[in-house]
A protein has these predicted regions:
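Acidic/glycine-enriched connector segments
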Residues: 11, 32, 39, 54-129, ...
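Generic N-terminal amphipathic, Lys/Arg-enriched alpha-helix
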Residues: 12-28, 39, 43-44
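Short active-site oxyanion
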Residues: 45-48, 149-150
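Active-site nucleophile and cofactor-binding loops and adjacent substrate-binding regions
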Residues: 49-53
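Short acidic-hydrophobic, aromatic-tinged amphipathic segments that line or gate anion-handling sites
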Residues: 90-94, 136, 149-163
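A charged, well-structured terminal subsegment
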Residues: 107-110, 154-173
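Short acidic/histidine- and often glycine-rich active-site loop of Leloir-type glycosyltransferases
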Residues: 143-146
Length: 173
C-alpha cells in the first residue's frame, strides 16, 4: 500500500485508533498513569480518541501532546472551547453521554482507566460490539456473584499500551 491509501475507517494503513475512557475526577495516581499511557500510545503512532474533557481525558491528551502525537476529543456539548487544552482535535457532538457510542465505534481497541458509570457504560458497549478492552485500575465484572474474565487488566501504563496496541493490531475493519 502506498502512504495515502486508507483501510476501512482506521485512517492511514497501520495507524491504530485507541480509545481511552476514564474518570473525570480521578485520584492523582490515575492522572499520572493516564499521562504515561498517552505518551506511550503516541510514541507507538496511535491516534488517541477520548471524551475530550477533564481528569483522565486531560491527562492522556497531555501525554499524547508531550510525545507529539494526535488526540481526538469527542465532546459532549456544542462548543470546541469545552475541550481540554491538550486536545489535538476537538469535535463537539452535542450528544451528551451518547458520545460514548461514538468513542467506542471510532476505536480499534479501548483502554479503561479508573472511571465511574460512564466508563462502565463504555466498557460494556465495547464488549457488546466486539471492540477489545484493556483495563487499568478500572471496573471488574461479575455475573451472579462470579467473576467474568471479559478483558485483560494491566498493572501499569506500559503494559496497558502494549496490550491495547496488540489488540488493535488484530482488528480488521
Amino acid at each position: 500500500m502506498s502512504g495515502g491509501e486508507q483501510t476501512g475507517r482506521t485512517g492511514p494503513a497501520g495507524v491504530p485508533y485507541v480509545g481511552v475512557a476514564g474518570a473525570s475526577r480521578p485520584e492523582p495516581e490515575l492522572v499520572e498513569l493516564a499521562e504515561v499511557l498517552g505518551r506511550r500510545l503516541a510514541e507507538a503512532g496511535a491516534v488517541v480518541v477520548c471524551g475530550g474533557g477533564s481528569g483522565v481525558m486531560t491527562a492522556v491528551c497531555k501525554g499524547v501532546a508531550a510525545a507529539g502525537g494526535t488526540s481526538v476529543g469527542l465532546l459532549p456539548g456544542d462548543s470546541r472551547a469545552s475541550g481540554n487544552p491538550y486536545l489535538g482535535v476537538a469535535l463537539p457532538t452535542g450528544l451528551g453521554e451518547g458520545r460514548n457510542v461514538l468513542l467506542v465505534r471510532a476505536s480499534d481497541a479501548l483502554v479503561a482507566v479508573g472511571g465511574g458509570f460512564g466508563t462502565l457504560s463504555e466498557i460494556a458497549l465495547a464488549l457488546r460490539v466486539g471492540v477489545p478492552v484493556v483495563g487499568l485500575r478500572t471496573w471488574s465484572l461479575e455475573l451472579a456473584g462470579r467473576p467474568v474474565d471479559a478483558f485483560p487488566v494491566a498493572d501499569d501504563p506500559d503494559e496497558a499500551a502494549r496490550l491495547v496496541l496488540e489488540a488493535a493490531a488484530r482488528v480488521t475493519r
